[in-house]
Amino acid sequence: FLILEDGNVFTGTSIGSTREVISEIVFNTSMAGYLEVLTDPSYAGQAVCMTYPLIGNYGICRDDCESERPWPDGFIVRELSRIPSNFRCDCTIQEYLEENGVPGIAGIDTRALTKILREKGTMNGMITTNEAYDLNEVLPKLKEYTTGKVVEKVTCREKYVVAPTTELAQNGPLSGLSLI
């Protein structure tokens, strides 16, 4: 279930981790790049609703990550592709969410959710698999929730060097490229 602080409840299928999470609910309109969204530190403290209807079709390619781990507290999709089609794929999005403890929900009307968020602004919500939730207990928790100190959460503790990961980059300087 996805429960919003305004009382709206969406019923879907659990994806990723089955842990319960309260988070700020936001949406992203990208047609591709869900891995970049998942690994973008600017989404820390938020659960991201992807507006494009099919997510996961090219799987997870770890070389394409923006950072070493996913940052959103939750992930919301209309339809999750369970069989990726990509020769570079390391794992499915389901496996990636599970191994990183990120809960999510699939099978909900993400257009309706996006319309609510667009009209009312971002709001807090809960992703839960608890069928016996009590709305009268959940809503006050949602209204009280704050994202906390997300800058501290995403900031590196020590500097580090990022080494080239592709064969092309390891063979020396790239020619014929313009940097803007």
Regions found by a protein language model. Name each.
Residues 1-180:
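RNA-binding accessory domains that recognize and position tRNA/RNA substrates
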